[in-house]
Regions:
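Short alpha-helical
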Residues: 15, 49, 62, 97
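Short, flexible turn/loop "capping" segments at secondary-structure junctions
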Residues: 1-4, 45-48
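An amphipathic, aromatic/His-enriched active-site/gating alpha helix that lines ligand/cofactor pockets
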Residues: 26-41, 57-94
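Active-site-flanking beta-strand signature of metal-NTP-handling nucleotidyl enzymes
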Residues: 3-11, 53-55
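Short acidic/glycine-enriched loop/turn segments that link adjacent beta-strands
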Residues: 38, 48-51
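Acidic/histidine-enriched, glycine/proline-rich intrinsically disordered or flexible terminal extensions
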Residues: 92-107
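Short, surface-exposed ligand-recognition loops at beta-strand->loop->(often short) alpha-helix junctions
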Residues: 11-23
Length: 107
């Protein structure tokens, strides 16, 4: 069984960046408690427009599918929806660059 690396872009709603960062930092620990992600440390960064990007690893596609039925994960995602919109990577200016660079966000 191989892992699945995902890249997610969270565009904060006005005035919600700090709440979003707190949720992003707690996302993988929450998913670990549910045994859905690997031990890989996520990479969190910021695009020029303020969008937060996270790279993390699920245990498998089955784990991703299970998350969509897990009440703890669904509750976490509802908190995300209150403070951000998930956007496609191609909406970021950096995605048009050969070597997309982002600002690292410390833990």
């Amino acid at each position: 069984m191989s892992g699945v690396i995902v890249i997610v872009a969270y565009r904060p709603k006005p005035g919600k960046e700090n709440k979003l960062l707190k949720l992003v930092r707690n996302r993988v620990p929450t998913l670990k408690k549910e045994n859905l992600v690997t031990e890989r440390v996520p990479t969190i960064m910021r695009a020029r427009d303020g969008t937060i990007i996270e790279v993390s690893e699920w245990k498998s596609q089955a784990a991703i599918d299970a998350a969509h039925k897990n009440p703890n994960v669904l509750a976490m995602w509802n908190k995300f929806f209150a403070v951000c919109d998930c956007v496609s990577l191609n909406t970021l200016a950096e995605a048009k660059e050969m070597f997309a660079g982002f600002e690292p966000i410390a833990d």
